[in-house]
Amino acid sequence: MSPPTVKLNSGYDMPLVGFGLWKVNNDTCADQVYEAIKAGYRLFDGACDYGNEVEAGQGVARAIKEGIVKRSDLFIVSKLWNSFHDGERVEPIARKQLSDWGIDYFDLYIVHFPVSLKYVDPEVRYPPGWENAEGKVELGKATIQETWTAMESLVDKGLARSIGISNFSAQLLLDLLRYARIRPATLQIEHHPYLTQERLVTFAQREGIAVTAYSSFGPLSFLELSVKQAEGAPPLFEHPVIKDIAEKHGKTPAQVLLRWATQRGIAVIPKSNNPARLLQNLDVVGFDLEDGELKAISDLDKGLRFNDPPNYGLPITIF
């Protein structure tokens, strides 16, 4: 079972359903990636600050060695962390990440957040985070244009086939499009029924930029991080609207939430260490929701954002 794809403006095909590596434990990551490949997953969404790229690469290498897939069958995504936004820092960290994965190119390399932090040498702290080695948050001076120019050079050198952005507002995206030599192929955003961001999604898609949703299950991913906004939000899996639609179609609430996105052309990157749920999450294009059902889910929008630096006690305002 392999998911359908969406054609990127770079000319490459990106799977509509992938496996997200955020919060995948190091001791299980290699096996989870390997099992996901066996189940039919081809897109893996990583980032250097997830701290598990070496292990993810081990899972990929095992699957390739056993002949389950070729490298060309996979779509591997990673991200540029905020402390490497200076133009001269982009290529070195991308090369390190490629080495960690054990591959020679990324299918998609993304600017993780539209904010520059002061450089921290990977020898001092890696994986990186919002705070430096002294526990302080220090803003950098790199502009998005400087960073994007360096991202474009990764495409020129064959280190990334496509480049994209994440957590950008419509205003920042509009500005980026004014000077980009290579347009962003994708925009990755927090997107679930409590935060639909419909105008941003419409704008990106109108500009030929594919949208990928993260945290498709809303507050679920953030409960263990003690995000207060998540603790006070009703779980989407238990919401009557979602449960009723799932029961009608003979699907799980998770499948309904993922189909709500994919039916609107938005890619999703859920994760699971449960073999049955792995297959269920992949099987989210074999049924269609009615227009009224899509609207009922979208009407749950509260403008409720969970992945926001201030929610973690960080003194940075992005959104």
UniProtKB/Swiss-Prot annotation:
The UniProt similarity line reads:
Belongs to the aldo/keto reductase family.
Task: Tell me which residues are marked as the site Lowers pKa of active site Tyr.
Answer: 79
GO CC annotation: cytosol; extracellular region
- Name the chain's protein: Probable NAD(P)H-dependent D-xylose reductase xyl1
Q: Which gene encodes it?
A: xyl1
* Molecular-function GO terms, alphabetical: aldose reductase (NADPH) activity; D-xylose reductase (NADPH) activity
| Transit peptide found in the keyword field | no
Q: Where is the signal peptide?
A: none
Enzyme class, one word?
oxidoreductase
